């Protein structure tokens, strides 16, 4: 059982954010605010969501993309963080798992995810 004051605070934090409905296997683009010295800028990070974890304001997603020289880069983002300005779903993936950690061992075309077809 959780404290009702904490639950009310978390609900107030969640209301302000516009988070789209997505799941593991979807390709997402996150607009992340980066602060360098006294300057701030927005950098897009696009990749496949390989895991969603947690609930409420503590919810996180793990996003994997392939960088230069075919090196996989994974970052964990708290969804309700102030540093995330926007989350956009680029394409829906057809997967049968909630956690796609097996993609770490695959390379090239084997690491592709089929697109989900709507009926």
UniProtKB/Swiss-Prot annotation:
Pfam family, one: Ribosomal_L19
Domain of life: Bacteria
InterPro entries in the cross-refs: Ribosomal_bL19, Ribosomal_bL19_CS, Ribosomal_bL19_sf, Translation_prot_SH3-like_sf
SUPFAM superfamilies documented for this protein: Translation proteins SH3-like domain
Cellular component terms (Gene Ontology): cytosolic large ribosomal subunit
Molecular function in Gene Ontology: structural constituent of ribosome
Biological-process GO terms, alphabetical: translation
Disulfide bond annotation, renumbered to this chain: none
Keywords: Ribonucleoprotein, Ribosomal protein
Function: This protein is located at the 30S-50S ribosomal subunit interface and may play a role in the structure and function of the aminoacyl-tRNA binding site.
Family of the protein in this entry: Belongs to the bacterial ribosomal protein bL19 family.
NCBIfam families: rplS_bact (TIGR01024)
PANTHER family the UniProt entry points to: LARGE RIBOSOMAL SUBUNIT PROTEIN BL19M, RIBOSOMAL PROTEIN L19
HAMAP family per the UniProt record, alphabetical: Ribosomal_bL19 (MF_00402)
Protein name: Large ribosomal subunit protein bL19
Organism field: Sulfurimonas denitrificans (strain ATCC 33889 / DSM 1251)
């Amino acid at each position: 059982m959780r404290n009702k004051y904490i639950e009310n605070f978390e609900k107030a934090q969640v209301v302000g954010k516009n988070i789209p409905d997505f799941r593991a296997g979807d390709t997402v683009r996150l607009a992340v605010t980066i602060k360098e010295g006294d300057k701030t800028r927005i950098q897009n990070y696009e990749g496949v969501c390989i895991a969603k974890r947690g609930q409420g304001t503590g919810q996180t997603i793990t996003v994997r993309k392939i960088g230069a020289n075919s090196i996989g880069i994974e970052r964990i983002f708290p969804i309700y963080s102030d540093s995330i300005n926007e989350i956009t779903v680029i394409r829906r993936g057809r997967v049968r798992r909630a956690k796609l950690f097996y993609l770490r061992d695959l390379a090239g075309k084997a690491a592709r995810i089929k697109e989900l077809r709507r009926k």
